[in-house]
């Protein structure tokens, strides 16, 4: 039973493990010697047969069986009952045709049909006769200059020239550097140099004195002021409208009491202009500066035709061309032979001061005496194999040993230096790997292969072997430190124990311990089995040359000799190097305070720390003064008195005074240093190993809808280009940094089989099926370095990069080889004081220093007695205006204002002042004050940088004397006006002008008559000039991660990497598991606290240049440091070696003008000048005959025009437009995030193996070549250094189209491109005969807008405008706004060059304000300038984000109800009918479109047509009793021929007895106005006698009565929509309209007119009662008519 349970348990465990492993990754690497990849395999014994089980339950019913066979026939049945009546039969046949009927009556003729569609076009006409062949056209203009061709082949060597002695030969090659010359005498002082570039802005000067009182400014924009004092009574208003004549006559109210004084009346009209003022008392202005050069005048009239010139003589032969490009680098030379042994070095020199200059080490000495007793002998021969041991039993693990005592705390180690140490001791043997394949045959030894049939048990552990052989002799060490003078002898008391230090780093393995005592001899053990082959030990370093050996037989080691006697004291050596600075001593005891002499009064010290608050002072007299200007920086204070004697420091360590010391052992690694400053960008290192794949990225956010008229998506990736021309060989790069140690290599490749060749490659297999995506494999080994491919084609020129940040100072170069020691020179004379140095870069802000010692205490003087108040002074003269006062106390928070209107867009703000310092950080470890480091050597020349930003305006260089050029003279006096010349010939078309301002919209053109034939597609144009690079694009939205790529094939095994530098010891890991299965790595520990700063170590070797780091974020602009004081002039140094050529010097003083030189070479073609004005139109020529069609040559594309001004931002379009053309390539963006891992490429073709196996040594660097001309874009460079190792994600899914970005700002102007290729020359035609004078042409289309005209004179002052409609003033609280803060000071501009003084012109008129210029690039942030004058009002600013809600203000007084303001009209119309003779005014705030007469409806052919009184069609501008005409089918129209009628809204005039006509009609016809309303108007009806309210947010226009319907012509009439304003008439009348007869021209009220009105309905009558009939007489009519109100939405 127990066995069964165990069996079940094992099976369960196996199943569980299989299930658990089902979803996991199978990992084939060995794990602790076990095979963990498969499931458990268990083979227990088979169990005995079990007991029989109980009887099972009854099974379910089986399925239905198959159908049986057919049975026998039954007996015949009985007769059935009769059936029901059957259905109807089918329809019968068609009967015979009937008799024809009678003819019908003719129908009424139908209406004429619609005109038919346009017929198809007619047939083409006959071709015209072919015209006569025209004369050939004139010669075309010469083509533009083509781009420079490819450099030609190097020409053959020229013929020798016999040069007479007067000619100067060609310049020879540069000679070898000459020896240093003798120091020349001191030269005379040089001329002062040219004015240098503008220095950095100086410190802000003190505020200047207040200026004189300025002229009155423009009238400001006032805010609503506080409520004023009540005004006087206004003028009487105009007479009101006549009263409504209703049925009830209103007698008026009794007179009330006298009211209180009224509100102020409306603002009066502006007064008339006052008399002109007296002339001002200003003095005559100073002479103005010379005016700018005028714009080119208008072209003169056309001149007479010139005669044809004579052909010029042929030109002279050109001069010899410039030097060609430098040739390619030659091949590497063969390694030279080994040189001879050099001359012996110099002996010891002793200079004048007695200093010994030691020479090089001497030759090896003679062999020494026989040595002392040697160590243990070499290992003996190998003994015979022992007997195989017994199989070991697995022992029981021992008990845990007792816990050891805690060790003493170790001293703090010095900081180690990162060096590449020698190879370490061999590590412990690893576990046995799987057996490898047979290796290649060993070339050195021949061994018999031992065939082990079965592996034996492991043998017992052998004894420790004897001591190994002596190692090779080590390298001689450097001299050690020496402190001959000893340390400070005073020993301080022991300090208090410090706090426990942070966890130290894991130390390196300790040194090998001393050998222990020899154990007693063990019994002879049996011979062990052959052990595993140990790993190959590392090669030792190369030893120095050994001593000569005299004896051929190695002697036995002698006994150890006695200790030698004390040697004599050696000669005092040279002073050793400075020792390591000791630790800071403890504070000394207070010294004796001797009475010092009183020093001079010191300058004020630095402010001390904030003291305790003092007691409150007595109240002072007087008002607070204005703050004084900031003082200049004070003088430098004198040095303080020497401090008191400190306590004696601890005794220093005296090193033994041995000058030629040997290297000590390597120190323990120090604590990690603080992070250094960001290094400069390193050179590319060797390619690192491929990083592991990153995890899949998060899905990107979906893009927004693409809008039309914007650049489209990038096109598909083009096909691979053709291979490019071979590029020039690049310079050898610096050696890369040593890579990190490579991973252990995989199984070695099979050894070479000499004599056999590689077989031919097999045929390519078929495409396999796509496998499932594999899991992430182990990192592949680095592949072999591929053979360099052919250089690619010339790539396109890269875009202009963004200006790089200035690189940091380069690292110090490697020290040069030391030259021969020079003899120490005498002290030179003190040099002349140097020029002030250039201001250095602002230093980085240092860490906060230690708290200084307390300053010396000077006795504080007693406070003086309080002075008596002085007598009042005399009244002074009126002072000049004071400087601006201090900002007042902040006002109490005013009441909350209404939301202001959207402001204008402001100019870009000035860069802000430095922000408030952040909160104080944690206290840093005190840094030691560094000494000023030596200037670094010049770095290696960097690669060519990106094109920089345009520099500032340079200093004008002195003009080179050129032939036939004179300096520009002063501007001459103005000549008298010349007479008008003849019209000149029409000039050539000028260059494309700058885009003018947007012209006014042109008049619409007439539609074309003939549709043009669609032309053939023209040939592709030549490549246009490259556009300007766009500004840097904003970072795009991260796309979705792509699908995982397929696993790449394993690369070819790479060459072994160079040994990497030893890394710093890692942090201590967690305790590993005891089982031999690798545990998962633990989480990263918390960073330890910073250790104490170690003492300064010796200077380490210069490390290799590191990999380039990622591009850092742009740092914040540091605070400008104070300008340092110029240092005292230093003593002259020893003459140095000859330096490298210096940087170009600054421009010297401008020399005098030299004599005219010989004519210079023809310069390159200049940039096109600014376009001239268009010439006058030429005289009309005579019409020529038709020429033959010339060959169609596509013209050269013109140069790209200058970019136009930035357009206003358009409204977003609707819908998804078609993808636009690909946009111009933007400027180089910031460095993007590391890209996702692309799919694995196909395996490359095997590289070509070059025949040479020996790599040559790099050649010496060549001399610098001449500056070449601007080359073409070079070939694509080699692949850059590997990016930082990051997890490469799978390729993302394509994102949705992004939103189009806003239109970018204007880019910088690009460099003009090369001129296009010249077109093919056409055939020269015959000269045509002059044609006849043509007829004047039609008026052409409107021309392009002209240049802006000259500014006109100031016009007379316009008359005062009419008072505008008052705006809608919301009920606002009176807000008292405090004056805003002063604006930031503007940046001072670069001072311009001084122009020539012009003649004094008359004082010009005040110019108009210019348009805002194109915003320039942001200049560098200057120091704060002086406060600028008040600027012009800025453009409206963008609406800022909504501010936080302010505290609720105090309740202000209620303002007067404002007049309704004008809002933006959007085209709604509103019709107002007055029902009187007067034209009704439009409601306030609406504009009147037209006025007219109120037409209600018309009747024609006994049919009525109604007009809605709320629509503009009911207000006809002109009145007629017959406002329409009728027409019939015969295309005949009649007017006033029938009894047709028109019906008009009527007035309140009494009903006449007879029809009225002509001049009596107007008093009965209602007038109307059509108004433009800001929103829709509606009518609301109460169905009650009360006036309904407008909906919330709507305002009332008028109230009235609900007019529903009307009839007049029998049953004909019309009605009003109850939502229309026409259904609400202001006056109620039983007969609100009058009938006019068209034919008779009369109007009258007839008895068949009825008006229908909405009636009142009580709430209870809705469904409960029947309507009761009633008749209302005059006087009661209003009681049953519904009231209404017309409302409009308030905006």
Swiss-Prot record:
Residues 1360-1371 have a biased composition (Polar residues). Keywords: Basement membrane, Cell adhesion, Chromosomal rearrangement, Collagen, Deafness, Disease variant, Disulfide bond, Extracellular matrix, Glycoprotein, Hydroxylation, Non-syndromic deafness, Repeat, Secreted, Signal. One of its GO terms (molecular function) is extracellular matrix structural constituent conferring tensile strength. Residues 108-338, 404-473, 486-881, 915-1099, 1185-1459 are annotated as: Disordered. It is found in: Secreted, Extracellular space, Extracellular matrix, Basement membrane. SMART domains: C4. SUPFAM superfamilies: C-type lectin-like (SSF56436). Residues 185-197, 311-320, 421-431, 503-512, 526-541, 641-652, 660-703, 722-735, 802-820, 853-878, 1055-1068, 1234-1253, 1384-1397, 1429-1459 have a biased composition (Low complexity). GO terms for cellular component: collagen type IV trimer; collagen-containing extracellular matrix; endoplasmic reticulum lumen; extracellular region; extracellular space. Prolines at the third position of the tripeptide repeating unit (G-X-Y) are hydroxylated in some or all of the chains. Its main location: secreted. Residues 1-22 form the signal peptide. InterPro entries: Collagen, Collagen_IV_NC, Collagen_IV_NC_sf, Collagen_superfamily, CTDL_fold. Residues 198-213, 432-443, 491-502, 1275-1284 have a biased composition (Pro residues). A motif (Cell attachment site) lies at residues 515-517, 560-562, 986-988. Type IV collagen is the major structural component of glomerular basement membranes (GBM), forming a 'chicken-wire' meshwork together with laminins, proteoglycans and entactin/nidogen. Alpha chains of type IV collagen have a non-collagenous domain (NC1) at their C-terminus, frequent interruptions of the G-X-Y repeats in the long central triple-helical domain (which may cause flexibility in the triple helix), and a short N-terminal triple-helical 7S domain. There are six type IV collagen isoforms, alpha 1(IV)-alpha 6(IV), each of which can form a triple helix structure with 2 other chains to generate type IV collagen network. This is Collagen alpha-6(IV) chain. The lineage of its organism: Eukaryota, Metazoa, Chordata, Craniata, Vertebrata.
């Amino acid at each position: 039973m127990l066995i069964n349970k165990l069996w079940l348990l094992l099976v369960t465990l196996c199943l569980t493990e299989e299930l658990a492993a089902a979803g996991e990754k199978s990992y084939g690497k060995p794990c602790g010697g076990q095979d963990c990849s498969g499931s458990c395999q268990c083979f227990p014994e088979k169990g005995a047969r079990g007991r029989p089980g109980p009887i099972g339950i009854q099974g379910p019913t089986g399925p239905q069986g198959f159908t049986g066979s057919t049975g026998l026939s039954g007996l015949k049945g009985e007769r059935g009952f009769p059936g029901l009546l059957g259905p109807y039969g089918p329809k019968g046949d068609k009967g015979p045709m009937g008799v024809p009927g009678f003819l019908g009556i003719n129908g009424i003729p139908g209406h004429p049909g619609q005109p038919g569609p346009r017929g198809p076009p007619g047939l083409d006409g006959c071709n015209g006769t072919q015209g006569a062949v025209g004369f050939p056209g004139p010669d075309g203009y010469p083509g533009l200059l083509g781009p420079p061709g490819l450099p030609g082949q190097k020409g053959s060597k020229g013929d020798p020239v016999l040069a007479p002695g007067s000619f100067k030969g060609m310049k020879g090659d540069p000679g070898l550097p000459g020896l240093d010359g003798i120091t020349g005498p001191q030269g005379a002082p040089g001329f002062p140099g040219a004015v240098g570039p503008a220095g950095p802005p100086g410190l802000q000067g003190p505020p200047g004195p207040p200026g004189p009182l300025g002229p009155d400014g423009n009238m400001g924009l006032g805010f609503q002021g506080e409520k004023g004092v009540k005004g006087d009574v206004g003028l009487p208003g105009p007479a009101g409208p006549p009263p409504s004549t209703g049925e009830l006559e209103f007698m008026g109210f009794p007179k009330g009491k006298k009211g209180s004084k009224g509100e102020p009346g409306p603002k009066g009209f502006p007064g008339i202009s006052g008399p002109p003022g007296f002339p001002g008392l200003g003095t005559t202005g100073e002479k103005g500066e010379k005016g700018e050069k005028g714009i080119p005048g208008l072209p003169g009239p056309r001149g007479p035709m010139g005669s044809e010139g004579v052909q010029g003589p042929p030109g002279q032969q050109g001069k010899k061309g410039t030097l060609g490009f430098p040739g390619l680098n030659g091949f590497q030379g063969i390694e030279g032979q080994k040189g001879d042994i050099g001359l012996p070095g110099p002996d010891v020199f002793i200079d004048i001061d007695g200093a010994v200059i030691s020479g090089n080490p001497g030759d090896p000495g003679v062999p020494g005496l026989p040595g002392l007793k040697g160590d243990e002998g070499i290992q003996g021969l190998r003994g015979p194999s022992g007997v195989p041991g017994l199989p070991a039993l697995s022992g029981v693990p021992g008990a845990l040993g007792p816990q050891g005592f805690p060790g003493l705390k170790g001293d703090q180690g010095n900081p180690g230096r990162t060096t590449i140490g020698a190879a370490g001791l061999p590590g412990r043997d690893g576990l046995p790997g799987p057996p490898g394949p047979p290796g290649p045959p060993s070339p050195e030894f021949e061994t018999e292969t031992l065939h082990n049939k079965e592996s034996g048990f492991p043998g017992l552990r052998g004894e420790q072997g004897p001591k190994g052989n002596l190692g090779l002799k080590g390298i001689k060490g450097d001299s050690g430190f020496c402190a001959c003078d000893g340390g400070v002898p005073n020993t301080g008391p022991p300090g208090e124990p410090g706090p426990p230090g942070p966890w130290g780093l894991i130390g390196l393995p300790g040194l090998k311990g001393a050998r222990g005592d020899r154990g007693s001899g063990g019994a002879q053990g049996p011979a062990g089995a052959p052990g595993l082959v140990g790993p190959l030990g590392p090669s030792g370093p190369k030893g120095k040359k050994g001593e000569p050996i005299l004896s051929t037989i190695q002697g036995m080691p002698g006994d150890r000799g006695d200790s030698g006697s004390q040697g004599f004291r050696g000669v005092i050596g040279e002073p050793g190097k400075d020792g390591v600075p000791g630790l800071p001593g403890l504070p000394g005891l207070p010294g004796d305070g001797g009475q010092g002499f009183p020093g001079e009064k010191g300058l004020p010290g630095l402010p001390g720390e904030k003291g305790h608050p003092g007691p409150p002072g007595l109240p002072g007299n007087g008002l607070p003064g204005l703050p004084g200007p900031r003082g200049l920086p004070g003088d430098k204070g004198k040095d303080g008195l020497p401090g008191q004697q400190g306590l004696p420091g601890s005794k220093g360590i005296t090193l033994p005074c041995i000058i030629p010391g040997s290297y000590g052992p390597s120190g323990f690694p120090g604590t990690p240093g603080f992070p250094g400053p960001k290094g400069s960008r390193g050179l590319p290192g060797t390619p690192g190993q491929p990083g592991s794949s990153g995890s899949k990225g998060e899905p990107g956010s979906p893009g927004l809808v693409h809008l039309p008229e914007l650049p489209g998506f990038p096109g598909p990736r083009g096909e691979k280009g053709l291979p490019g021309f071979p590029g020039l060989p690049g310079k050898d790069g610096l050696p890369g940094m040593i890579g990190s140690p490579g991973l252990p290599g995989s199984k070695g490749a099979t050894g070479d089989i000499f004599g056999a060749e590689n077989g031919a490659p097999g045929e390519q297999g078929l495409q396999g099926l796509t496998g499932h995506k594999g899991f992430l494999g182990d990192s592949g080994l680095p592949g072999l370095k591929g053979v360099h491919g052919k250089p690619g084609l010339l790539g396109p020129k890269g875009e202009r990069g963004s200006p790089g940040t200035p690189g940091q100072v380069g690292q110090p170069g490697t020290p040069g080889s030391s030259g021969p020691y020079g003899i120490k020179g005498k002290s030179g004379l003190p040099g002349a004081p140097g020029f002030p140095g250039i201001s250095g870069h602002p230093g980085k802000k240092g860490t906060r220093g230690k708290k200084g010692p307390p300053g010396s205490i000077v006795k504080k003087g007693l406070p003086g007695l309080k002075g008596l108040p002085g007598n009042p002074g005399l009244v002074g003269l009126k002072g000049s205006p004071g400087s601006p006062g201090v900002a007042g106390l902040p006002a109490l928070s005013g009441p909350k204002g209404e939301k202001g209107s959207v402001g204008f867009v402001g100019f870009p703000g000035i860069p802000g002042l430095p922000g408030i310092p952040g909160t104080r950080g944690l206290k840093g470890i005190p840094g030691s004050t560094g000494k000023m480091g030596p200037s670094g050597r010049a770095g290696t020349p960097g690669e060519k940088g990106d094109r920089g930003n345009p520099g500032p305006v340079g200093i004008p260089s002195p003009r080179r004397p050129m032939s036939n050029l004179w300096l520009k003279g002063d501007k001459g006096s103005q000549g008298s006006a010349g007479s008008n010349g003849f019209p000149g010939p029409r000039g050539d078309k000028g260059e494309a002008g700058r885009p003018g301002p947007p012209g006014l919209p042109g008049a619409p053109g007439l539609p074309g008559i003939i549709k043009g034939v669609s032309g053939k597609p023209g040939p592709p144009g030549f490549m246009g000039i490259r556009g300007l690079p766009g500004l840097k694009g904003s970072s795009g939205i991260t796309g979705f991660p792509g699908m995982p790529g397929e696993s790449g094939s394993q690369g070819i095994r790479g060459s072994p990497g160079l040994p990497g530098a030893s890394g710093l010891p890692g942090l201590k890991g967690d305790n590993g598991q005891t089982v031999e299965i690798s545990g998962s790595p633990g989480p990263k520990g918390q960073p330890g606290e910073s250790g104490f700063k170690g003492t300064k170590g010796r200077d380490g070797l210069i490390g290799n240049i590191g990999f380039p780091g990622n591009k850092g974020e742009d740092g914040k602009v540091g605070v400008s440091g104070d300008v340092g004081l110029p240092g005292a002039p230093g003593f002259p140094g020893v003459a140095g070696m000859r330096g490298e050529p210096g940087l170009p010097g600054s421009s010297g003083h401008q020399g005098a003008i030299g004599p005219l030189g010989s004519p210079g070479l023809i310069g390159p073609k200049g940039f096109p000048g600014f376009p001239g004005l268009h010439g006058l139109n030429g005289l009309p020529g005579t019409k020529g005959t038709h020429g033959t069609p010339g060959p169609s040559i596509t013209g050269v594309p013109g140069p790209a025009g200058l970019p136009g001004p930035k357009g206003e931002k358009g409204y977003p379009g609707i819908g998804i437009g078609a993808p636009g053309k690909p946009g111009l390539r933007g400027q180089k963006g910031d460095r993007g995030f590391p890209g996702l891992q692309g799919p694995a490429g196909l395996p490359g073709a095997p590289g070509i193996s070059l025949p040479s196996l020996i790599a040559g040594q790099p050649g010496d660097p060549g001399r610098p070549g001449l500056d070449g001309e601007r080359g073409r874009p070079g070939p694509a460079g080699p692949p850059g250094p590997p990016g930082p190792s990051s997890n490469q994600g799978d390729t993302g899914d394509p994102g949705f189209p992004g939103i189009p970005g806003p239109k970018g700002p204007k880019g910088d102007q690009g460099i003009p491109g090369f001129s296009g290729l010249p077109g093919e020359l056409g055939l020269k035609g015959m000269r045509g005969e002059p044609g006849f004078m043509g007829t004047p042409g039609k008026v052409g289309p409107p021309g392009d807008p002209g240049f802006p005209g000259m500014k006109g004179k100031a016009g007379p002052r316009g008359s005062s405008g009419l008072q505008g409609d008052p705006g809608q003033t919301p009920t606002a609280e009176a807000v008292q706004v405090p004056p805003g803060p002063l604006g930031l000071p503007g940046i001072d501009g670069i001072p311009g060059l001084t122009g020539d003084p012009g003649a004094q012109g008359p004082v010009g008129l005040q110019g108009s304000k210019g348009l805002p210029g194109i915003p320039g690039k942001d200049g560098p942030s200057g120091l704060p300038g002086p406060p600028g004058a008040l600027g012009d009002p800025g453009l409206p600013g963008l609406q800022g984000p909504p501010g936080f809600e302010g505290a609720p203000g105090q309740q202000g007084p209620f303002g007067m109800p404002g007049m309704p303001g004008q809002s933006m009209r959007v085209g709604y119309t509103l019709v107002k009918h007055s029902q009187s003779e007067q034209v009704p005014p439009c409601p306030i705030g609406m504009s009147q479109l037209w006025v007219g007469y109120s037409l209600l409806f018309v009747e024609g052919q006994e049919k009525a047509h109604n007009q809605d009184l709320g629509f503009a069609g009911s207000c006809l501008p002109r009145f007629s009793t017959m406002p329409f005409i009728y027409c019939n089918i015969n295309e005949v129209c009649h007017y006033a021929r029938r009894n047709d009628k028109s019906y008009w809204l009527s007035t309140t005039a009494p009903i006449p007895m007879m029809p009225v006509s002509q001049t009596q009609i107007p008093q009965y016809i209602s007038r109307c106005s059509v108004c433009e309303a800001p929103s829709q108007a509606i009518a609301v009806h109460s169905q009650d006698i009360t006036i309904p309210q407008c909906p919330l947010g709507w305002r009332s226009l008028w109230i009235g009565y609900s007019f529903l319907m009307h009839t007049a012509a029998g049953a004909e009439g019309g009605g009003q929509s109850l939502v229309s304003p026409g259904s609400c008439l202001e006056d109620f009348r039983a007969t609100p309209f009058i009938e006019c007869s068209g034919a008779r021209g009369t109007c009258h009220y007839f008895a068949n007119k009825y008006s229908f009105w909405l009636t009142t309905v009580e709430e209870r009558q809705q469904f409960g009662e029947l309507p009761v009939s009633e008749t209302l007489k005059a006087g009661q009519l209003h009681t049953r008519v519904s009231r209404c109100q017309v409302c409009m939405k308030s905006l």
